Amino acid sequence: KKISYIFLTEFNKSKFDKLIDINSNQVFVKPNFVSRKGEPSKGAHKRVFIFASRLEENKGIKLLLELWKLLPKDYCLHIYGDGTLKNFVEENVKENISFYGFTPQKTIFEDLSTATALVFPSIWYEGFPMILAEAMAIGCPVVSTNIGNAGDILVNSKGGTTFEPDKPDTFINAIEDVLQNNKIYQKNALAYYSETLSKDKNYVLQNDIYEHLFGGG
C-alpha cells in the first residue's frame, strides 16, 4: 500500500526527506489553521513587545531577559504566562519589564493588537507554535529565534524577523528591524494568515490533498 505524509512546515518535510527516500507525490505540507482571537492590529504606537508562553527553560524566557538588558530603557517587555520559572521572572522585573502572570487570552490579544511585536525566543524545536500563527492572524509581527519550525514560519511568511540565540547582535538587529519596518511586517503577517492559516484557506489545502490522494492525482 502507498503511504503518504502531511507535514506542518517545509522544515519538517526537509528533515523527513533526509531520513527517507520517498516520492515527492507522497509528501504534502499543510499548516494548522487558527481563528482570530482579537481585532486586526491597530498599529504600534510605542515600543512594546510581548512574550506569551509557558515560563520554562525551553521557551527561552531566561535568554530573553538577558538579551533585554542590551536594549534602550524605553523598549518595554510585557510577559504573560506561568510555569516553573515564575519566581525567576518576578526577580528580574525592571522598570521596562512588566510581568502579568497567567492572563485570559482576551487580555493578551488586546495587548498584542497594539504591540510592536510578539517575541518568541524558544531555544528548542517546536511542533507548530500556535501563538505565532495567532499573532499573525491579527497582524502582529513576530521576532523569533531561527530554530526549527518557528524560524521556518517567519522565513516563509515574512511576517517578522529572526535572530540567532547565541548571537546577541542579531537580536538587537531583529528588534530594530521590526520597529523600522513594522507596517510592512503587519501587512505580510495578515496576508500570510489569509493565504495560509485561515480556516477557509486551510480547508482548500486539505481538500486539495485528499483530491490528489483519492482522485487519482
Segments from the language model and where they lie:
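Short hydrophobic beta-strand element within catalytic cores of glycosyltransferases
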Residues: L132, P141-S144
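Conserved donor-binding/catalytic core segment of Leloir-type glycosyltransferases
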Residues: I6, N32-V34, S41-K59, L65-K69, ...
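Donor nucleotide-sugar binding/catalytic pocket of nucleotide-sugar-dependent glycosyltransferases
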Residues: K1-E39
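A charged, aromatic-enriched C-terminal amphipathic alpha-helix characteristic of glycosyltransferases
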Residues: K183-F214
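Short alpha-helical segment that forms part of, or immediately flanks, the ligand-binding pocket
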Residues: F109, L132-A137, G151-D152
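Conserved acidic donor-binding segment of nucleotide-sugar-dependent glycosyltransferases
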Residues: G101, N156-P168, D177-K183
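Acidic donor-binding loop of glycosyltransferase active sites
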Residues: S113-G127, C140
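Nucleotide-activated donor-binding/catalytic signature segment of Leloir-type glycosyltransferases, i.e.
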Residues: F88-K106
